[in-house]
Curated annotation (Swiss-Prot):
GO molecular function, one term: imidazoleglycerol-phosphate synthase activity
Disulfide bonds listed in the record: none
Gene Ontology terms: cellular component: cytoplasm
Family: Belongs to the HisA/HisF family.
EC number(s) recorded for this UniProt protein: 4.3.2.10
Domain of life according to the entry: Bacteria
Protein name: Imidazole glycerol phosphate synthase subunit HisF
The protein's annotated pathway: Amino-acid biosynthesis; L-histidine biosynthesis; L-histidine from 5-phospho-alpha-D-ribose 1-diphosphate: step 5/9
Taxonomic source organism: Clostridium botulinum (strain Alaska E43 / Type E3)
Gene: hisF
Amino acid sequence: MHTKRIIPCLDVKDGRVVKGINFKGIIDVGNPVDLAKHYNDQGADELVFLDITATHEKRGIMMRVVEEVAEQIFIPFTVGGGLSSLEDIKAILRAGADKVSLNSAAVKNKKLIKESAFYFGNQCIVLAIDGKKRRDNSGWNVVINGGRIDTGIDLLSWVEEVTKLGAGEILLTSMDADGTKNGFDLALTKAVSDITSVPVIASGGCGCLEDFYDVLKNNTSDAALAASLFHYDELTVKDVKKYLINKKIPIRV
């Protein structure tokens, strides 16, 4: 079993870290620079920064905030939200990001995945895929624009396609589980991990220590991402790692 990663996520709106349930009911939870440093010091393996309204508002990402966060941390840093061109990606990497997360723009322009992987290396191209279960329970669809638009695209087919196009990693969020604290969507996560050779980061729904274990055991995922659980100090990164070590999950100390 490969070494697993614990990744806090900063969902940023108007320069502040926010959190909601199923991308709705947004509330302010803190300053992104302060929280980034806090998680870096706690021993997080990576940090994800998502400007959650950049695409919907048709604007660029908050570059200044990205630069300030990058100055405060010494762990791999992924940035996403509103990136729609090679120029956008180049600017974010120059601002201090180690990886970029593509979501809505990649669905609208598949060529961006292939070109960005070619120019910048697939190791820094993370495909963020938000999935929602179909009403007839026959599988999952890809949703974009912060969950506002159901594309009708079959999620598993999309995973296979983006892997072939050069995505180096999948950041998989279950819209059904997001913010509920009822546990990760294990069925969705396992289904994705089974059909792709690239690492899968599970996101959405984590509510307790056992949820981390459930999604990381048996190679269900390569990494687990959480937000509100860490923001509200219900658990620390150290708590999670100590628990996983006791459960014999390979993790960086």
